[in-house]
Amino acid sequence: MLLTLSPAEILHTYQTLEKIFPKPIFPKQFQKVHTLGDISHLYDAFFFDAFGVLNLGETAIPLAAERIKTLRQQNKQLCIVSNAASVSRQQLFEKYTKLGFDFSLDEIVSSRDALATYLHTHSAENYGVTAPIGTKLNDLNGSFINLIEYPDAMDTVDGILLLSSQDWTSSLQETLIQSLITKPRPILLGNPDLVAPRDNGFSLEPGFMAKQILDKAHIKALAFGKPYDNIFNLAKAKLKPNTALSRTLMIGDTLHTDILGGCNAGLHTAMVSANGFASTIPWQDTIQKTGICPHYVIDFI
């Protein structure tokens, strides 16, 4: 979906969701440092948000790949923790390899992985899915109908999977909302992000679609990904035995997903302020108003 909101409006929307987000204990104040290199000696493991930290859209952020290589040379544990739901882990691996990063397949955890884990024991049968036509869903347990390809199926499916906003239109969104008002059904949310930073701005993401449905149809989606435990539990399971959570750092550009979720998972957190969503808002005022405080604010990794 095309962006029609200003950064201030996006921030306000995140703030209206605070009542349904986890409520961890945050640091009382943050420490401002220039780059991740200034504090990397304090940590054994690093969890990286992708969009806004490693890349903007299809472009790698300058020097990000070099930082990853440096941390690897220091024998640090590394993992991407991303709210990417529309592609498989293999596709994410191929994307970041192409962008110049040397993450292994096992060093990537996505909200789709958290969703797939849930569906192992809760099959989604006859679910309508929001995703580009041709999206592969082989890793997800259930039967799915693509609502872009078959919009008339909205009234007949038994549930909705909000997987991607790509190719989803405002008209389709309104039709879906009206269908859910008439016939309420369960909703699975594969990506809680409201927006994603791109090369030339932001795109509206499935989290925004879920917020509209919550407001108008009064159906709360079951969400997978940051800031929720389901994705962090998968990432923490990859840590070496005896790795202290207090020596594990979550790095992201969004207070309400990366920082809130990282703190809720018992990790230390660092917000990137020169790239991504944080660079578009008065982040110091936002930290003060929301109380969502990272351990560090860094310019970039």
Sequence positions of predicted segments:
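Short glycine-rich or small-residue beta-strand-to-loop segments that form or flank ligand, phosphate
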Residues: Q77-V81
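Conserved nucleotide-binding/hydrolysis micro-motifs of P-loop NTPases
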Residues: V87
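Conserved phosphate/oxyanion-binding catalytic-loop motifs
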Residues: A84
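Asp-based, Mg2+/Mn2+-dependent phosphohydrolase catalytic module
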Residues: M1-K76, Q90-V109, A116, H120-G128, ...
